[in-house]
Design a protein with these regions (language model features):
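Predominantly soluble domains enriched in secretory-pathway, periplasmic, or organellar proteins
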Residues: 19-341
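Bacterial Sec-dependent N-terminal signal peptides
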Residues: 1-27
Length: 341
């Protein structure tokens, strides 16, 4: 996710030039407000609950729950060390967090935020996802190279699906029996038959490398894979690459708005790339919205079309710091950027 100022400027100018020459207008998205959370710790995926006015934030050893409109704290879920993501099962009134350093999932009550149970999973569960076709909770176990399948009715692991690779990331579903897994170390999409609980295909993403964030348009059957400075658009029926589009550096999250047909990539360099799905086979980069360094993950509130990107402030590096040194996060600077039109 390293990016020099010079390279960032070139990328931004080039994007502006291309948009101007082609007559494309800017997306209109901008940072409308910033929610500040004083507690320490890093961050990963946020989750906007479509069934309530709550925003859930993976934050070090806990999950912060905020009011989506005001940013006010409405709860905290503790003992989720290394938390990566949050998923919801509204029909059962339950939520699930993937706790990477604890190798488990926390089950909590959506209404109260109270913890109901912890479920052991594979090693370092990363993405956690409610799959609507099978009605199961699935975790991608980043260090274990497999998926844990949980029945939310019993809150028990009912299957483990081996996936080749040791860096499995985001999972998406076609809502018809197939799920798609980003394999970061293999630079491919792994296809799983969720009924048979078995891998059926491996689809290479080349020239895309290091895929992390993933989104899907279930209507047009298009997958959107956030790779190293590229968004790869893939046919979800056969793995054919439809398009490849330039995005900012350090993407770790992709969101899709099914109503506006917009794809958003959160880029750790400090931009959000906005791409329009004109049709199933035509895509255009229309904007690179300034955000903040470190804002690499994203979630969307599909009702309001609001986007949420967590980040923090960074301490300046010493002049003699070795190349590749990562800056430290300023303690207590955790925040969420709220982007609207």
């Amino acid at each position: 996710m390293k990016q020099s100022i010079t390279a960032l400027c070139i990328f931004s100018i080039a994007s502006w030039f291309c948009n101007t020459v082609s007559g494309q207008s800017a997306s209109g998205y901008h940072i409308a407000k910033t929610f500040h959370i004083a507690s320490p710790g890093g961050w990963d995926y946020p989750a906007a609950d479509a069934g309530s006015n709550k925003l859930y934030l993976s934050h070090g050893t806990q999950v912060n729950i905020l009011d989506k409109e005001t940013g006010d704290s409405v709860g905290v879920i503790s003992n989720t060390t290394g938390v990566h993501g949050i998923a919801f099962v509204h029909s059962l009134g339950k939520g699930y967090t993937s706790n990477g350093r604890l190798n488990n999932v926390t089950v909590f009550d959506l209404a109260s935020g109270n913890v109901l149970k912890q479920i052991a999973t594979g090693k370092n569960p990363d993405w956690v996802f409610y799959e609507p076709f099978s009605k199961k909770i699935i975790t991608s176990n980043h260090s274990g190279g497999d998926l844990s399948v949980i029945d939310p009715a019993s809150d028990e692991v009912v299957a483990t699906i081996p996936v080749i690779g040791n860096a499995v990331e985001t999972i998406m579903s076609d809502n018809a029996g197939k799920i798609f897994v980003s394999a970061e170390d293999k630079s491919e999409i792994v296809v799983v038959d969720i009924t048979k609980l078995a891998v059926t295909d491996h689809w290479p993403l080349s020239p895309g490398e290091g895929p992390t964030g993933l989104a899907i348009d279930v209507e047009t059957k298009r997958l959107f894979s956030g790779c190293d400075k590229l968004l790869i658009v893939m046919d979800a029926t056969n793995g054919k690459i439809i398009d490849k589009l330039p995005i900012g550096d350090g993407c770790d999250g992709v969101a899709f708005d099914p109503e506006t047909k917009m794809v958003f990539t959160a880029n750790g360099e400090g931009t959000m790339t906005v791409i329009k799905e004109v049709s199933a086979n035509e895509f255009k980069v229309i904007d690179n919205v300034p955000t903040k360094r470190g804002a690499r993950t994203i979630t969307i509130d599909e009702k309001t079309h609001t986007l949420f990107l967590p980040t923090g402030d960074y301490e300046p590096l010493p002049a003699n710091a070795p190349k590749g040194t990562r800056p430290k996060i300023v303690p207590g600077s955790f925040q969420v950027l709220v982007l609207k039109k």
